[in-house]
């Protein structure tokens, strides 16, 4: 948002930005007050976003935040009017919306050290940081040894903590899988994301996919989420061993099969760069010899 504009003109600019973007995509504004005033002018509540109204096409769910002078003065160069209340507001909004920015030359405060910066980024749910500005502060964090950790934990960072599964399954019968994923990052995804369980034949690479009714945007920071899957194997699925993968692709059809847009789990040794799959380090045996439960539901793997 351009500085020096009155509230009515800011509203007009923001109207056009939201109109130009696809539904569900988000813009960012310089201060919490910009968003709150825009909502007030539109007759909307100015309280922080909650799970009840997040991820909708409502205007409150489509306006995130950008701090131009992070930890650079008592008010971050005018980012905050009421520092305590505004930070509380941003911490709540950052659970559902993009929050990030850049540093500035400190004015009236000491440069933020690593511990303070990391604590503040986690509290405010930061998803990105400008690496080019301000070098004086960024280089300080590099010298103090925390920049690599900041990069790892910025935004979401999903770690598979445990899992269990049916090891032997008959075609047409029930496969059970339970996964637990912890988000060790500062924030959560703010754009939609698909989730798929993938079975791939060890011998000939034939692949079967099961879309899951799971929303990774709800895997919030410092929380562990459980995914429980009960699905059927196709009745004509060939006998053999199959490795299990978790795929978190972009849901847009033009990007869904592009591994560059798939989410990579933080666990070592699980990422498959050529497909964008995350190996669960699990293998099932599809066999005609096992007496397992017949599956009569609607969730069935399909051949890719």
Which role does the model predict for each range below?
Residues 33-36, 135-136:
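Solvent-exposed loop/turn segments at secondary-structure junctions
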Residues 25-31, 130:
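A structural signal for short, well-ordered beta-strand segments and their strand-loop junctions
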Residues 148-304:
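Extracellular/luminal regions of secreted and cell-surface proteins that mediate adhesion/ECM remodeling
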Residues 1-5, 9-12:
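Single conserved hydrophobic/aromatic residue that forms the stacking wall/gate
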Residues 13-27, 123-124:
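A structural motif corresponding to the C-terminal end of an alpha-helix
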Residues 35-39, 188-189:
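Short catalytic/ligand-binding loop motif for oxyanion handling, primarily in non-cytosolic enzymes
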Residues 53-164:
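Substrate-binding cleft of secreted/luminal carbohydrate-active enzymes
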Residues 20, 29-34, 41-44, 48:
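Non-catalytic protein-protein interaction scaffold segments in large eukaryotic complex-forming proteins
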């Amino acid at each position: 948002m351009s500085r020096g504009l009155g509230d009515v003109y800011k509203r007009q600019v923001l109207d056009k930005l939201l109109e130009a973007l696809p539904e569900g995509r988000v813009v960012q504004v310089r201060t919490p007050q910009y968003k709150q005033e825009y909502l007030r002018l539109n007759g909307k509540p100015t309280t922080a976003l909650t799970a009840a109204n997040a991820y909708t096409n409502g205007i409150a769910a489509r306006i995130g935040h950008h701090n131009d002078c992070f930890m650079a003065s008592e008010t971050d160069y005018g980012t905050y009017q009421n520092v305590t209340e505004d930070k509380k507001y941003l911490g709540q909004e950052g659970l559902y919306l993009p929050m990030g920015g850049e540093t500035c030359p400190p004015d009236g405060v000491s440069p933020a050290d690593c511990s303070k910066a990391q604590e503040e980024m986690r509290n405010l749910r930061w998803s990105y940081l400008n690496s080019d500005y301000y070098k004086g502060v960024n280089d300080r964090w590099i010298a103090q040894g925390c920049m690599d950790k900041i990069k790892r934990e910025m935004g979401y960072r999903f770690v598979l903590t445990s899992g269990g599964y049916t090891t032997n399954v008959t075609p047409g019968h029930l496969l059970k899988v339970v996964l637990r994923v912890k988000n060790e990052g500062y924030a959560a995804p703010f754009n939609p994301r698909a989730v798929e369980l993938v079975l791939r034949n060890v011998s000939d690479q034939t692949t079967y996919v099961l879309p899951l009714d799971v929303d990774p945007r709800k895997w919030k920071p410092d929380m562990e989420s459980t995914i429980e899957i009960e699905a059927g194997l196709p009745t004509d699925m060939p006998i053999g061993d199959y490795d299990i993968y978790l795929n978190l692709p972009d849901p847009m059809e033009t990007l869904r099969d592009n591994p560059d847009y798939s989410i990579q789990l933080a666990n070592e040794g699980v990422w498959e760069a050529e497909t964008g799959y995350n190996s669960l380090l699990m293998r099932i045996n599809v066999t005609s010899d096992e007496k397992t439960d017949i599956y009569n539901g609607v969730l069935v793997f399909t051949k890719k």
